[in-house]
């Protein structure tokens, strides 16, 4: 099934197209992938954005956190995904400490694009990353900012917890999102925040906001591939869902996920968080 050249049946997804989808009220469907085979399958299912996430440290390498993942590993897995030549836009994570300085950030983002073939990079961090985002934007590198729960800070945060439940924290996150947009971010990933805050930030920005555990009112949704296929060891996060339940095949599960996000059926209240926001 996956030998030879993968079929090209869709127009390529671009940054401009994602922005038009937000303007038109069409939900953006994103999903992680770490290899050629699943990149082909996701593209055929209609996924708009494939994220080569540093989550590979946990779901591929079996580590406890994403912190040990290296730039070399990200380049390798990004290259595997882009070998599928998907119509979906391929976004790659900047791993922990790969953008500790502006020079590091520029160099490693360039590696992910030149060596890995990524079309966008994603980096965690609040308003303090605005200068790097601006530098990357001036260099012609599309950027997805990442706010809310930031897995690379798990040791500082003391675990994986919902962020932005207090009013002051929610206001600060909205201000950070606006600062990152003003600096030149093309996309925002918002993780593990109250649904009301997800709505506020999505409505407060012109760029698309992709949620993961951020409620149904974001401009799109993203989940981890292994979670939606029900193969993640242990419990999956509350905001995720096993789409293999009732599906006859992996491809059917991927299509069910795409349809659920596109229609707005996912996430529902059971897969969202309450709180002040």
Swiss-Prot record:
The keyword Cytoplasm applies. It catalyses: 3-methyl-2-oxobutanoate + (6R)-5,10-methylene-5,6,7,8-tetrahydrofolate + H2O = 2-dehydropantoate + (6S)-5,6,7,8-tetrahydrofolate. Its cofactor is Mg(2+). Its main location: cytoplasm. One of its GO terms (cellular component) is cytoplasm. One of its GO terms (molecular function) is magnesium ion binding. The active site is at residue 191. SUPFAM superfamilies: Phosphoenolpyruvate/pyruvate domain (SSF51621). Keywords: Cytoplasm, Magnesium, Metal-binding, Pantothenate biosynthesis, Transferase. Pathway: Cofactor biosynthesis; (R)-pantothenate biosynthesis; (R)-pantoate from 3-methyl-2-oxobutanoate: step 1/2. It is an enzyme of class 2 (transferase). Mg(2+) binds at residues 54, 93, 124. InterPro entries: Pantoate_hydroxy_MeTrfase (IPR003700), Pyrv/PenolPyrv_kinase-like_dom (IPR015813), Pyrv_kinase-like_dom_sf (IPR040442). Binds 1 Mg(2+) ion per subunit. Its EC number is 2.1.2.11. It is found in: Cytoplasm. The keyword Metal-binding applies. 3-methyl-2-oxobutanoate binds at residues 54-55, 93, 122. One of its GO terms (biological process) is pantothenate biosynthetic process. NCBIfam families: panB (TIGR00222), PRK00311.1 (NF001452). Catalyzes the reversible reaction in which hydroxymethyl group from 5,10-methylenetetrahydrofolate is transferred onto alpha-ketoisovalerate to form ketopantoate. Belongs to the PanB family. HAMAP family: PanB. Homodecamer; pentamer of dimers. This is 3-methyl-2-oxobutanoate hydroxymethyltransferase. It comes from Alkalilimnicola ehrlichii (strain ATCC BAA-1101 / DSM 17681 / MLHE-1). The lineage of its organism: Bacteria, Pseudomonadati, Pseudomonadota, Gammaproteobacteria, Chromatiales.
């Amino acid at each position: 099934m996956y030998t030879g050249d993968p079929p090209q049946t869709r127009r390529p997804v671009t940054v401009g197209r994602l922005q038009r989808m937000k303007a038109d009220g069409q939900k953006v469907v994103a999903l992680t992938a770490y290899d050629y085979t699943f990149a082909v399958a996701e593209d055929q299912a209609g996924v708009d954005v494939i994220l080569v996430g540093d989550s590979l440290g946990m779901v591929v390498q079996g580590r406890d956190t994403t912190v040990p993942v290296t730039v070399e590993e990200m380049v390798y897995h990004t290259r595997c995904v882009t070998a599928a030549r998907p119509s979906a836009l391929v976004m790659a994570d900047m791993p922990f400490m790969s953008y500790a300085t502006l020079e590091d950030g520029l160099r490693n983002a360039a590696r992910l694009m030149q060596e890995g073939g990524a079309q966008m990079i994603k980096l965690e961090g609040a308003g303090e990353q605005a200068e790097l985002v601006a530098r990357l934007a001036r260099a012609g590198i599309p950027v997805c900012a990442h706010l809310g729960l930031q897995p690379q800070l798990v040791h500082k945060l003391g675990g994986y917890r919902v962020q932005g439940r207090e009013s002051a924290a929610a206001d600060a996150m909205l201000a950070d999102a606006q600062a990152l947009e003003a600096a030149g971010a093309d996309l925002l990933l918002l993780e593990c925040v109250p649904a009301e805050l997800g709505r506020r930030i999505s409505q407060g920005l012109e760029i698309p906001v992709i949620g993961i555990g951020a409620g149904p009112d974001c401009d799109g949704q993203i989940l981890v591939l292994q979670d939606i296929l029900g193969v993640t060891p242990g419990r999956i996060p509350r905001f995720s869902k096993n789409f293999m339940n009732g599906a006859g095949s992996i491809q059917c599960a991927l299509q069910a996920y795409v349809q659920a996000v596109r229609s707005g059926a996912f996430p529902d209240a059971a897969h969202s968080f309450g709180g002040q926001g």
